[in-house]
Amino acid sequence: MMTVLSHKLNIVHRLCPFGFMQTLNRLHAVALMLCAIFMVTMFTSCIDEDEQPNTPTGNFEALWRIIDQHYCFFDYKQQQYGLDWQEVYVKYKERVSDRMTERQLFEVMTNMLSELRDGHVNLGASYDYGRYWAWKEDYTSDYSDSLERIYLRTDYKIASGMKYRVLDDNIGYVRYESFADAIGEGNLDEVLSYFLLCRGLIIDIRSNGGGELTNAERLASRFVDEKTLVGYMQHKTGTGHNDFSELKAQYLEPSSRLRWRKPVCVLVNRGVFSAANEFASMMHALPNVTLVGYRTGGGSGMPMSNSLPNGWMVRYSACPMYDSQKRQTEFGIEPDISLHLDDADTRRGVDTIIETARNVIKGK
């Protein structure tokens, strides 16, 4: 088993990876660093007093306690579906013994974490990655790559992670599949210049599972002309379920480069998660933007990670983020116009959600 000191250093490394911190803007970076500092202090002091042995029982106890002290959505999920973390402990504790195999333990612990219903909660071992994906898998997709090919055709343009073209009714269409695909200011200048004479813009982020928050913010900054309140953030201040800081306002600064003032529709579905969910939340706060599609997948907690005595990694939501009205978006954002893909439309090669967005922009 690693020493307490090396365990602490490992936690600091996992909580504050340099590359991840570099991707956040100043406000998010400060908030996340404060969150990490508090969590390192709390968790390392806990290790000094209650370090668990590297046994199935010890790893189970360590996992339950990490989540108990640092997870950020207990109260919200108790309200939403009756989550009781102490009851979860009792339920799964009886399934753990020091005679079970490593893979049996992994299954039990993954099932326990699934009680949180959080796509940002994972258990990582060398042979598997425990996850909860029901937030998207239990719902219809409301997106079709075959329909995308019909609308983009074969002569679409590509600017880094964005595919784009002008539709037949002079409406710009951008398909952005993942915020893990970087976009530069030059990319955005070229795309918006290309659409300069268009009557409106459709940004399709359906099934975008997230990525780098800075990409989401860089894109959103092209749609505001002044510093705009887009949300709030908190961090844990102690190990209790209700130990949180005051809400800290998060603002979107306008880009100093080319900006868009015409109507915008953002297309969403259940596959919109994490940084993509945050993009939808930011855009939802803007007056010229309409969200069209189905409720997003959520994932509004900034994730942190710790290691267990056996070396497994556990990731969890640590810092809650809210929309501009101080509402939770952990379980998704309801669009302004809610609808599914219509089966009859799909058979005809028509994307119901894109067509609805076109009508919104045309004022129909």
PLM region spans:
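Active-site-proximal beta-strand/loop segments in catalytic clefts of secreted hydrolases
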Residues: 175-179, 204-208, 233-236, 266-271, ...
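Flexible, low-complexity junctional segments that flank or bridge functional domains
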Residues: 45-235, 242-248, 313
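Cyclophilin-type peptidyl-prolyl cis-trans isomerase
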Residues: 276-294
